[in-house]
Structure formats: C-alpha cells, structure tokens
C-alpha cells in the first residue's frame, strides 16, 4: 500500500487539510491501494506559487538541454514500465496488457518531443521598412496547470507534461482523485529521470471542488498562465469560462459520443472486432469509446448476430488476466453507469450477456473470470433498436454499453453521426 500526498516545491505536503481517504482496488474492494492525504484550494495556490518561483530558472536552461531531460525521462519510464503498469491495473482495474500499452505511450511521447528542443524555431519576417528587421522567438508560457482524468492515468498526463516541460514551463499537475497513486509514481519517475529542479513539476492531490477553487484563486493572483484539462464537458465548460475571464485559452479534451458507420460492403468480422474493442475496452470508460453503431439496414441483422456472439464470448473479469475489460474505475462511475442503464426502454432489444447491471452471484455472467462479488464488474450491454431521439443515443454513457441503429443512405448516416453534438472520434 502506498501513502500518497501532494508534493509542492519538491517536498511532500505533510498535512491533509481536506481529509484522508482509503482508495480501494476496484477489482478487489477489500484491498486498499493507497492511503491518500487530500489537499485543498490553498495547496493548489501554494503549488502554483512554487511553480512561479521555479519557472524562470528552468526557462533559462537551453532548450536542447531540456530535450535531453525529456529523453532521460523516457528511458527511466521504460525501465520501470512493468511496475507502473501493474499499479495502473491495481488502482483503476485496467487490464494489464492495456496498462502496459498506456505506459508505452509515455515513452513514445518522450521520444517524439526530445528532439523538439532543437526545433523551437522562431521566424524572420520581411519588413516593409528598410531599416527594420522582424524576428519572432518561442518563449515559455510560464506556469501551466494540468488537470487530468483517471481512465488514462499516465498516458494522457504525459501529453501535457512532456511538451510543457520541454518548452520551459513549470507545471502544477492535479491527477484524478481516484488515481493519485499512479500520479505520484509518475511524478517520481519524471523528477528522477529528468533531474527536474524543485518546483518545476508539482503534484496536487485534491478533489474537483477544491481544485477548481484553488485554480480560480491562483489565476486571480496571476500565478497560472495556461490550463490544460481532460474530463467531462460540463467541467470543461466551467474551466473554459474561468480561463476566458483571464483572457487565456484553455486546452480542453472533453467527452465524446463516438459513432461507427458499418456500410453494406463492410467486412463484418472486422467491424465486429473493432466494435468489441472500441465499445468495451476499458469497460467503455474512454472518451473515445464507441457509443453507437450506425449500420446499414441491409446488413443490420447479420452484424447484430455476430456482434452479440462476440460480446457474449468476450472475457470479462480479473484485470490481471487476459480479459477484454475489468471493473469500473471507481464506485462513482459505477453509480452513474447504473443511471444510464435506466435509459434502456421497452422499444430496445438488449443483447450481449446473460444479464444487465452489476455482475453478482444472483446476476451472473457466463464465463466470468475471477470473483465478481468483490469488485465493480458490470455486464456488457448491446442496445439494439436505438432511435436518434433516445437519451442513450444523444449522451455519453461512459460504461460497457453500445447502441445500434440503422441507416439507408450515406447522408443519413453522416447526419446520425453528427447529431449528438460531440466532436471527438468516429469510424467507418
């Protein structure tokens, strides 16, 4: 079991002003992964101030040297990949093979950006005046606040942290409050690998309400120059509005309701394979998870029959084994997903498993891997007969549920794909 707390200016924060919590393994609820000391708004402001104090000296390090630091981070993460992947599996229940691939994304991100330290080019611009020359330079933004979700607790943060650090910024990173152990482990690898000076990277462990309050206070005090956020569209809208009040543009990666169009000429076996992984990988808890299959009416029956068979045969359960998906990430997502199941109506045909809802001894799934009673495991659900006015069609569901509807013309398929109003991913 790990003890997790905020780390500000290179030093762990000893107290827990917002209390403590014991974070369970979602696949084994009687196993505590971490004892977590929660910070508050003041912790966030302190971290932003530490970042401000450290940023100028970090920016003065030549960009190619910062690039070498990024390269070292990648090598240290690579050397510790299996250990970090096991922690991802333990803390959020992501299948180990998938978790290992996620850790690899950190390494790939470092490998991509390490050379950018030599390519932070400015421009020379022609002037209309004979005695003038115009130049542009790439300068760091300053202090960057990064707030990330826990469904990708190490890969997605690297997409923010690596380029921000390379460019000479100091960072205040707030990982999800249900994946703080992964955040602390990643922080340690970044500081060890990059030899980062104290305060260049700060870790804040807090809930969403305290984080937003701290971010607002820090921005009002002029301590944060840029915000990056991955999470729900509702929270993203609030952060975007806060940034706008300070004339800043936030980097927002939000929710999705992602369609897959299956054409009459499609390879149905390939379509089923894609729908299975996209819809049910990570228990459907990705922003890019498949939401609705929009299938041509001429191949609907055959596709649904094959899809149903594939989902029924899919291994679900213990994430340390070779399953398609494991538990829900956290109890709050399990409760929310149960509300989404209430959107299934009488006009729908429910397929994919021997039941719906939580997998228990009284509501079993054939072929379940492991002990369902001790984890947040849920049946996979296919909802056939979805219409474009259904809540399940229009809204992100964030769980192991995929809708199916039909189309006649390509224009109709495109219209259906765009109707939910999200703009994240799609497949044909």
Range-by-range predicted roles:
Residues 30, 66, 88, 110, ...:
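Residue-level signal for inorganic ion chemistry
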Residues 30-120, 131:
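Glycine-rich loop-to-alpha-helix module at the N-terminal edge of alpha/beta enzyme cores
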Residues 192-197, 313-315, 390:
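Short helix-capping segments at alpha-helix termini
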Residues 1-36, 68, 72, 120-148, ...:
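Terminal low-complexity tails and localization/encapsulation signals of metabolic enzymes
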Residues 122-270, 407:
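Rossmann-like NAD(P) dinucleotide-binding subdomain of oxidoreductase/dehydrogenase enzymes
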Residues 87-95, 125-130, 206, 321-326:
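Short linear capping/connector segments at secondary-structure termini
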Residues 234-387, 409-411, 416:
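ALDH superfamily catalytic-core signature
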